[in-house]
Amino acid sequence: MAKAANIIKVEQIGSAIRRHHSQRATLVGLKLNKIGRVTELQDTPEVRGMIAKVQHLVRVVDEK
């Protein structure tokens, strides 16, 4: 039986306006597009790297 994946909730706290296109693309990859939106993602090294890239625009709300 497969092990359940860890889930991480990420909230966008900063605007993508006047940000580099790669940071905007990272927000899209995290399924975020407006301030205050929260998404649930699998806790993987790739997602952690994306969060680190836009750490000034997002906040980790909950880790399960």
UniProtKB/Swiss-Prot annotation:
One Pfam entry name: Ribosomal_L30
SUPFAM superfamilies, alphabetized: Ribosomal protein L30p/L7e
Keywords: Ribonucleoprotein, Ribosomal protein
Subunit structure of this chain's protein: Part of the 50S ribosomal subunit.
Highest taxon of source: Bacteria
Organism classification: Bacteria, Pseudomonadati, Pseudomonadota, Alphaproteobacteria, Hyphomicrobiales
HAMAP family: Ribosomal_uL30_B
Alphabetical list of PANTHER family matching this protein: LARGE RIBOSOMAL SUBUNIT PROTEIN UL30M (PTHR15892:SF2), MITOCHONDRIAL RIBOSOMAL PROTEIN L30 (PTHR15892)
Name of protein: Large ribosomal subunit protein uL30
Gene: rpmD
Entry similarity comment: Belongs to the universal ribosomal protein uL30 family.
Xref: InterPro entries: Ribo_uL30_ferredoxin-like_sf, Ribosomal_uL30_bac-type, Ribosomal_uL30_ferredoxin-like
One GO MF term attached to the UniProt entry: structural constituent of ribosome
Organism for this UniProt entry: Rhodopseudomonas palustris (strain BisB5)
GO biological process: translation
GO cellular component: cytosolic large ribosomal subunit
